[in-house]
C-alpha cells in the first residue's frame, strides 16, 4: 500500500515532568510536525501541597514557615506579603528601621532570584559558562542572608510589625562591599552575553508578546515591562521604603525573549542602587513594633516560678482578624505576588487566596510556542521564569 506524499503524521511528545529545562515538575504535552510545534498543553499539579487550605488552620505566625516554600528562590517576598496582610488589616505600624531592613532584604532576594534565572536560562540555550559564574555572586548574597537571618534559604525572617532580629555588627559594611563588587560582575555578564551573536540568534524575535496582549493575559513583572508597559508596583503602591529612593523602572518595548533578559539585567542594577541608598540612610531605632507582642498573649503565674527560670517562654502573638476582606500585593522578581485575605473575627484566616505571578505568566506559553521550533520552547519557557512551587502551591 502506497502512502500519499501529502500526508503528514503528527507526533505527540511528553516534555517533562523530569526534563531539566522544565524548571521543576512541569509537563508539556506537545503535538509536533517534525520540528514545528502544532500544539502545547501544560499539565500542572505535580507540586500541589494545599498551601491555601493549610493557612485556614494556622495563625499568621504559625503559617510563616510554610510560605517560604511557594517561591523557594525568593522567599523574602512570600514572607513580606504574608505579614503585610495582617498589618494592613490590623493597622499595625512598622518602625522605620524595620522598613529599611525589609527593603534591603527584598532587593537582595530579587538579585539572587534573577541570578538563578540567568544561569539556567543561558544553560538551556547552550551557554554553560554563565551558569557557573552566577553561583559565585549568589553565594555572597546567601552569606549575607545567613549572617542576618541564620538561614541561607527559607529564612523565616519577617514578623508582623517588623523583622525577627536586627542586623549584626559589620553587616552593613559587608553588604556595601558586595554591592561594589557585584556591579563589576554584572558588567562581566553583559560583556559575555548581551552582544554574543549566538545568544542573539537564539533569543531575538522569539516569543514576542505585544503590549495589549500582555495586559489581556494578566501578565506582570518583567514579562509585562518587556512588552512596553512601565508598570512596577514598587512605584505605584509605594510599599516599604521605595518612594524614598532614586531609581528607574526598567522596561523594553520589543516584547521578545531578549527584551525580558534586558529587563532583568537592568533590574539587578537598579536593585543595587536601592540597596546602597538604603544602607547609607538606614535610621536607628527598634527593628520591630513591640506593641504587637501584647496582642492576646497568654501568661501563666507558674511561669515566674523557679522551675521555669531557665526556660524561655515567648508565646506566639496572635490577634483577632477583623471581619474584612483585603488584597495585598508586592512586586516579586517574577511579577505581582498577591494575597486575598478574608477575616471572620478569629485568629485563623477564613480564606487565604494566593495570586502567584508564575501561574499567571505561564498561561500564555501555549500561544507563544505554537508555530515555533521545538528548540525554541526552552528559550520561551526560560524567559518566562517560573518556579513550580508557587505555580502549583
UniProtKB/Swiss-Prot annotation:
Compartment(s) where it occurs, according to its Swiss-Prot or TrEMBL record: Plastid, Chloroplast thylakoid membrane
EC numbers: 7.1.1.-
GO cellular component terms listed in the entry, alphabetical order: chloroplast thylakoid membrane
SUPFAM superfamilies: HydB/Nqo4-like (SSF56762)
Keywords for the protein's UniProt record, in alphabetical order: Chloroplast, Membrane, NAD, NADP, Plastid, Plastoquinone, Quinone, Thylakoid, Translocase, Transport
Pfam families: Complex1_49kDa
HAMAP family attached to this UniProt entry: NDH1_NuoD
Its job: NDH shuttles electrons from NAD(P)H:plastoquinone, via FMN and iron-sulfur (Fe-S) centers, to quinones in the photosynthetic chain and possibly in a chloroplast respiratory chain. The immediate electron acceptor for the enzyme in this species is believed to be plastoquinone. Couples the redox reaction to proton translocation, and thus conserves the redox energy in a proton gradient.
Protein family per UniProt: Belongs to the complex I 49 kDa subunit family.
Protein name per UniProt: NAD(P)H-quinone oxidoreductase subunit H, chloroplastic
Organism: Pelargonium hortorum (Common geranium)
Source organism phylogeny: Eukaryota, Viridiplantae, Streptophyta, Embryophyta, Tracheophyta
Gene designation: ndhH
